[in-house]
Each structure stands twice: as C-alpha cells, then as structure tokens.
C-alpha cells in the first residue's frame, strides 16, 4: 500500500501556504508476512515535512507489536538555553564573620554579637560570663571584681585591703594595714618594741595619748576588774589585756574604723558600756597610730579570726620609716613601701598596666578556651556542691531515721518494762491469793475449834460412840458442814431483792466510790444489821456460790470492801488499809 502522493495542485498550494503541520503517523497491521518497502521519497518523511507538504506515513507492523496511535512529536518544546542563570543570588562570603563572639560553653553563636574583651582575668578567680571590664577598678590578687566599682584617686593599692570610695591618699604617709588615711595628718613616729624591754619604760607612747582618754581607759579597766601597777602606765595595761584576752567571736560594728576590724573594741575592754563608743573608737585609732598593733609580733593575739581578705598581723606590711619588729617576717612577695606613691603616679601606672596587656591577654585566653575550662570547673563545683547537699540530706534523713529507731526501741523497752511489771504484778496477785487461801484455811480451822469448844455436852455425848468414824471424816467436809450449820442459824428469814440486785451489779462491773455509796444506801434501806451482813459474807466465803460468784481471795476481799468497807471474817487476819480501818471504826460505832 502506498501513500497519496498525487494530490491536486490547488490543494498542495493551500496546504503549503498554511503553517507547518505534522500529521500523526498512522500504523496498521498487514496480513502479509513481509513488510512494505517504500520508495526513496516515501522513506524520508522528514524531507517532505521540511518542504511543507502534507504526508502520511503508513508503516506495516508485524503481528504481536503494540499499537501506539497518535503520538505527538516533542519538537515544540522551547530550548533549555532560554532558562535564566542564577547569578543574581548573593554570595555567602559577604556574611560578617563571627570571630568577635566569645566562646562560651553551651551558648549559641548569635550573628552580629560583639566579643566582650573588656573583662580582666584575675589569677585564681574564675571568669564570669558577660561581666564587662571596668577600667577604673584595680586588679588585686585574690579579690573579686565588683562590677561598677570605681577607682578612687589617691587611694593606695594595698594587697588584700578592700577599696573604699572617697578615701584620699596622702603623699609621704606610710601605708599601715587597717589604718585610715586622713588628709593633712602627719605620720606618727613609732618607737620600736624590743623583745625583753619592760613595758613601763614606754614613756613616749604614754605621753602621746590625751589625758581624757587615759583616764577613761583606766576607769574602764578598773571597772572591768583589771588592776595595773602604780608605776605602769595604763597603755601597758591595755597591751597586757590585749595579749591575755582571746579575740574571738566578736563582730565589729558596721560604722567602725579599720582598727575595729582588726581588734574589736569589745575585745580590748570587756565592758564597753563604761566608755562611749565614739571615744573608744578614737582611743583605738590613737593606739593604732602609737604602734600598739606592732606587739602582735611579740605577743600574738591567740584566737583572733583573720578578716576576710586581710592578712594576719604577723605578716603585716612594715611601716615606712620604722625598723621592723623582731620575730615579724615580712610579707612574702611584697616589697616594702618606702613611701606612698603620688596620686598621679598611681593612677597612671595602674591605667597603663591595665590598658597595655590586660585586654589582649583576656582576649587571647578567652579565645583559647578559658571560658570552657571555667564552665567545666563551674559544672564540677555545682556537681560537688549538689553531691554534698544530697549527702548531707541523706545523713540528716539517716539521723532522723536513727532517732526514730531509737525512740521506737525506747518504746519497746518501756513496753517490755511495763509488761514485766504487769507480770510481776500478776505473780504478786497470785501470791496474795495463795496467802489468802492459806489464811482462810487457818480461819476455818479456828472456827471449827471454837464450835467444838462451845458445843453442849448433850450434843457431844451421843457422838462418843462414833469417834473413830468422825476421825476418818475429812477435815474440809467437817469445816463446811459446821460453817453451813452455824450460818444458817444466823441467816434472816427472807432475802432482800435489792441486796440480790446489788450483788448482781458487783458481779457485772468494777464499782466506783459512787457505786459503793449506793450499795451502802441499799443495805441501810433493806434493814440488814451488821451481824447479818457479816454472816452473809461468811456464807459467801464458805459456799462461794450463794450470794456472789467470786472465788475466795482478792475478789471476795474487794467484794467486802465495796459492800461495806470492812473485811469479812475470812479476811480478818490480813492487814487492812488505813481507809478500811477508818470505815470499819465508823461502822462499828454506828
């Protein structure tokens, strides 16, 4: 089969003038086993498409090949060259560097955050994150840096001494630890103290003190119970008093001078109420300037707690212009101050040193990882502190538990003691019951003896023939028969229901004094005489079942107490209490 190549010319002209059109390729199956071989013009449909003519390509497909109908060509896709380039995207190289940011452990890097290089690094002090450096603050070894504390002009840099704002520096005045610097006051020449020199020869020190302070001091020492020799000045007494009294657990007042921080006034004079505080502080200042504190090298003040940040007196800075004391070692690593530095020199030297290398050193060390090390140390300290607190809490809980265990053990011991006492009490009660039983048996034998003695001969004579049989009868049976015979003769004709009700109450519960009074009133209403009452109780103790259910012993004894306050005949041999004897006397007289 061939395509339609011989089309009319008009139709070809119309189709050639129209835009390029591509007809879909039609394919169909042929029944022949061979494929159709087209001519050269037919075999190149691309040339026909370029020439503008319409062509239809018919291809023969073999059996079993899938049919793909109307598949368009992909020539209408625009070329990839028309895609714009991504040259307009800004480069990341223009992003500012974050080198100025300090390396803080666990802190994210924020873009644009400046590096804080103004914080000085003090040896032995952990750096604090985010704390700015104050240029006016001196660098003191071992002293924490307080943010915002200015450097006061004229203040000397003393190792370990806190900086107080507004304190002037006087040129030429020696720097004494703990001594306030007063502007315009000349330094006091101090007489050196030689070991072994008597204190009474210190006339110059005695003359330097004002007369009023000496008299007040002498009066205070006298009232405090400290007596000084006549030829010894009061200043020597103060020195001896400072050497003898321990200076411990004394808190100086907030408004006290630096002398009060070294030796509190309460330690110099035991009774500070005898001297005004202002005069006492003034006297302390004078004693400091006179060189009393230099005695610390000869007579150490035992027990004095050192002030926070202030070295002890034994290693104090030597005074300028005064020979060092014997036995006082100089401060290790601190040159003696020949004189006070001028104000301008102090400020210039401090500022130059601080600005020259502190900032660079701080930045280099911080970048090298000081803050990371500080964070590790801080975290280790927190863990140690948490462990100590946890261990302390566990110990406290363990102490509480141990204390609770001790209390429980004490309770158990007390309960055991009470139990033992109760057991002893029961044993004593059993012993008393046994004793009462023996006494009751003896009493019965005595009663039988009396009955035998008072029996008429007419009654005894018929029994003379049966004496062997009577001897065989048990003694207990004879006692019971005799008691029943005797008590039935004494028993009244009828029994009172009120008396029976009272006995029933006694069986049911323990009676109080109020119940005892009610029972006495019932006995009085029933009209029972004292003899009948005793007879009834004898019957109760002998038969054990007629008037009460109590057995013979302590129960019957308590029954007799509650009933009338007097023991019945079986218990007559026991020792009654004082109250029972009083009630018995009262009942016998009535």
From Swiss-Prot:
Region entry Disordered, spans: 1-71
Domain of life per record: Eukaryota
8 X 6 AA approximate tandem repeats of P-L-A-[GV]-[AV]-[PL] as annotated region, ranges: 300-347
Organ and tissue specificity: Somatic ovarian tissue.
Presence of the UniProt keyword Aminoacyl-tRNA synthetase in the record: no
Keyword set, alphabetical order: Repeat
Record keyword Repeat present: yes
Ranges for region 6 X 6 AA approximate tandem repeats of Q-[QR]-L-A-D-V: 419-454
Comp. bias intervals (Basic residues): 18-29
Location of the region described as 11 X 6 AA tandem repeats of approximate R-R-A-[GD]-V-[LV] in the Swiss-Prot/TrEMBL record: 348-413
Region (20 X 6 AA tandem repeats of P-[LP]-V-[EG]-[EG]-[QR]) location: 66-185
Sequence repeats: 66-71, 72-77, 78-83, 84-89, 90-95, 96-101, 102-107, 108-113, 114-119, 120-125, 126-131, 132-137, 138-143, 144-149, 150-155, 156-161, 162-167, 168-173, 174-179, 180-185, 300-305, 306-311, 312-317, 318-323, 324-329, 330-335, 336-341, 342-347, 348-353, 354-359, 360-365, 366-371, 372-377, 378-383, 384-389, 390-395, 396-401, 402-407, 408-413, 419-424, 425-430, 431-436, 437-442, 443-448, 449-454
Name of the protein: Ovarian abundant message protein
Organism encoding this protein: Ascaris suum (Pig roundworm)
Gene: OAM
């Amino acid at each position: 089969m061939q395509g339609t190549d011989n089309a009319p010319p008009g139709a070809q002209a119309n189709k050639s003038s129209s835009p390029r059109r591509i007809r879909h390729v039609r394919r169909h199956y042929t029944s022949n086993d061979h494929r159709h071989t087209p001519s050269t013009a037919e075999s190149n449909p691309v040339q026909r498409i370029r020439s503008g003519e319409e062509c239809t390509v018919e291809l023969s497909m073999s059996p079993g090949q899938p049919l793909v109908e109307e598949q368009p060509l992909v020539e209408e896709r625009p070329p990839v060259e028309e895609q714009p380039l991504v040259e307009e995207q800004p480069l990341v190289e223009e992003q500012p560097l974050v080198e100025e940011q300090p390396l803080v452990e666990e802190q994210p890097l924020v873009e644009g955050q400046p590096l804080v290089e103004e914080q000085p690094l003090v040896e032995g002090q952990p750096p604090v994150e985010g704390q700015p450096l104050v240029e006016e603050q001196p660098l003191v070894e071992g002293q924490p840096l307080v943010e915002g504390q200015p450097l006061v002009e004229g203040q000397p840099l003393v190792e370990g001494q806190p900086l107080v704002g507004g304190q002037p520096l006087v040129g030429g005045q020696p720097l004494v630890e703990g001594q306030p610097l007063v502007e315009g006051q000349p330094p006091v020449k101090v007489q050196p103290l030689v070991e072994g020199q008597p204190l009474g020869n210190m006339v110059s020190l005695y003359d330097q003190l004002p007369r009023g302070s000496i008299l007040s001091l002498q009066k205070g020492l006298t009232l405090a119970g400290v007596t000084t020799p006549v030829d010894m000045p009061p200043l020597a007494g103060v020195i001896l008093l400072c050497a003898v009294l321990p200076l411990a657990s004394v808190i100086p007042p907030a408004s006290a001078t630096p002398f009060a921080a070294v030796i509190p006034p309460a330690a110099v004079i035991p009774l500070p109420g005898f001297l005004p505080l202002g005069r006492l502080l003034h006297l302390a200042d004078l004693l400091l300037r006179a060189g009393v504190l230099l005695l610390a090298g000869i007579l150490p003040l035992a027990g004095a707690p050192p002030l926070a940040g202030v070295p002890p007196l034994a290693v104090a800075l030597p005074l300028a212009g005064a020979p060092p004391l014997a036995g006082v070692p100089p401060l290790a690593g601190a040159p003696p101050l020949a004189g006070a530095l001028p104000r301008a020199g102090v400020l210039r030297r401090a500022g130059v040193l601080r600005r020259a290398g502190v900032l660079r050193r701080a930045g280099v060390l911080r970048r090298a990882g000081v803050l990371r090390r500080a964070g590790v140390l801080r975290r280790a300290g927190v863990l140690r502190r948490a462990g100590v607190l946890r261990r302390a809490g566990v110990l406290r809980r363990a102490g509480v538990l141990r204390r609770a265990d001790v209390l429980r053990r004490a309770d158990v011991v007390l309960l055991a003691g009470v139990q033992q006492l109760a057991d002893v009490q029961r044993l004593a009660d059993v012993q008393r019951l046994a004793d009462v039983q023996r006494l009751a048996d003896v009493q019965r034998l005595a009663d039988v003896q009396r009955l035998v003695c008072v029996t008429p001969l007419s009654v005894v004579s018929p029994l003379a023939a049966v004496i062997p049989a009577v001897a065989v009868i048990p003694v207990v049976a004879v006692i019971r028969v005799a008691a029943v015979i005797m008590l039935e003769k004494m028993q009244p004709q009828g029994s009172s229901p009120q008396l029976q009700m009272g006995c029933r109450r006694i069986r049911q519960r323990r009676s109080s004094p109020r119940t005892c009074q009610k029972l006495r009133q019932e006995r009085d209403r029933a009209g029972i005489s004292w003899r009948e009452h005793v007879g009834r109780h004898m019957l109760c103790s002998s038969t054990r079942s007629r008037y009460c259910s109590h057995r013979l012993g302590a129960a019957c004894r308590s029954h007799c107490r509650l009933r009338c306050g007097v023991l019945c005949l079986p218990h007559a041999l026991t020792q009654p209490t004082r109250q029972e004897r009083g009630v018995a006397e009262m009942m016998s007289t009535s």
